[in-house]
């Protein structure tokens, strides 16, 4: 919506200003409500046996922040103009709060991904497991410190302050920040997937033709053909790469296609929408696969310290067919 000068403001425009504000507030409320429901759905359908990692803590913290944002927008929309502790809150603060959250979300992609990658790498590399209580406390403090650091940067950065003040006089116009971090992160992951598939596309096709589904401990499982000399510890990255690709795309292919579409059409999504729990779990699976591939010589499924993906059972990449002694009612289903 285009901003108008004060001398062009007529009585007719002022009469139409309130319905426009109400419509914009309701639209923002519905968007945040849909995002909150999507976050709750993903947190409910995740695997229950997943270990608590740094990314898990951040996903829950993001869902909590989205819920608090929804509550604040609801209060500001309902009461419209009120005073708390001498501070007057109006519809303008809906836009201000949304912009601050957008900037905060937009700058979180790189720190969260870097910390999660370090967390998974350390879990694979260390010889002794840290106390679960102290590890959870460390995760909690790291998440809190990350949120506070990014929020403090947003509030003290001069360029962001100028951007926030630029639209202070126009409560009907509230531009949202579009994160460049998510753009480059998504582009990088898609390029890595494309190169990995290009390198091992023949193995991927052969693997899909030989892969079968069976009932294992009352659960459906995928089994890949392994050479007889393969055990629990893998040292061949070439053999592991196609299995990681199949497992990853088997779960996240719709999300990969969505990312390709967004980048191809150059769709600009506000940061307060783009940073969500499904996106974080998608990045989480990619990071786990990357850490597995780089540390394939250290992998041992009998070690419970291995990171567990909430949506992908990576064990089907490592367990050889000839070791499966507990297969119940094998199904003659071949995926081609």
Curated annotation (Swiss-Prot):
The keyword Cell membrane applies. The chain crosses the membrane at residues 21-41, 57-77, 96-116, 137-157, 187-207, 244-264, 273-293. It is found in: Cell membrane. Residues 1-20, 78-95, 158-186, 265-272 are extracellular. It is a multi-pass membrane protein. GO terms for cellular component: plasma membrane; receptor complex. Its main location: membrane. Keywords: Cell membrane, G-protein coupled receptor, Glycoprotein, Membrane, Receptor, Transducer, Transmembrane, Transmembrane helix. Coiled coil: none annotated. Glycans are attached at residue 8. Residues 42-56, 117-136, 208-243, 294-336 are cytoplasmic. GO terms for molecular function: G protein-coupled receptor activity. Belongs to the G-protein coupled receptor 1 family. Orphan receptor. This is Probable G-protein coupled receptor 160. It comes from Mus musculus.
């Amino acid at each position: 919506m285009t901003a108008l000068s004060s001398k062009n403001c007529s009585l007719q425009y002022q009469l139409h200003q309130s319905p426009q504000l109400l419509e914009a507030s309701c639209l923002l409320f519905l968007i945040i409500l849909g995002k909150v429901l999507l976050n709750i759905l993903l947190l409910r359908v995740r695997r229950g046996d997943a270990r608590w990692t740094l990314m898990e803590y951040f996903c829950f913290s993001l869902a909590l922040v989205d819920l608090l944002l929804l509550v604040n927008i609801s209060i500001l929309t309902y009461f419209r103009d009120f005073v708390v502790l001498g501070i007057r809150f109006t519809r303008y603060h809906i836009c201000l709060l949304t912009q601050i959250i957008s900037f905060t979300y937009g700058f979180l992609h790189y720190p969260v991904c870097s910390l999660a990658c370090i967390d998974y790498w350390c879990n694979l590399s260390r010889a002794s497991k840290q106390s679960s209580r102290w590890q959870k406390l460390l995760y909690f403090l790291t998440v809190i410190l990350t949120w506070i650091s990014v929020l403090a940067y947003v509030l003290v950065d001069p360029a962001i302050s100028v951007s926030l003040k630029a639209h202070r006089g126009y409560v009907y116009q509230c531009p949202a920040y579009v994160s460049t971090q998510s753009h480059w992160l998504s582009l990088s992951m898609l390029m890595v997937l494309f190169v990995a598939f290009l390198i091992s596309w023949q193995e991927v096709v052969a693997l899909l033709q030989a892969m079968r589904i069976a009932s294992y401990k009352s659960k459906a499982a995928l089994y890949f053909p392994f050479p007889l000399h393969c055990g629990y510890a893998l040292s061949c990255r070439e053999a592991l790469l196609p299995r990681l690709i199949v497992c990853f795309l088997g779960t996240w292919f719709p999300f990969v296609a969505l990312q390709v579409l967004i980048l191809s059409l150059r769709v600009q999504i506000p940061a307060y929408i783009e940073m969500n729990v499904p996106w974080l779990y998608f990045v989480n699976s990619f990071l786990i696969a990357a850490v597995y591939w780089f540390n394939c010589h250290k992998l041992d499924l009998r070690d419970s310290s291995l990171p567990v993906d909430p949506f992908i059972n990576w064990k089907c990449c490592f367990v050889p067919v000839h070791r499966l002694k507990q297969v119940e009612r094998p199904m003659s289903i071949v995926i081609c």
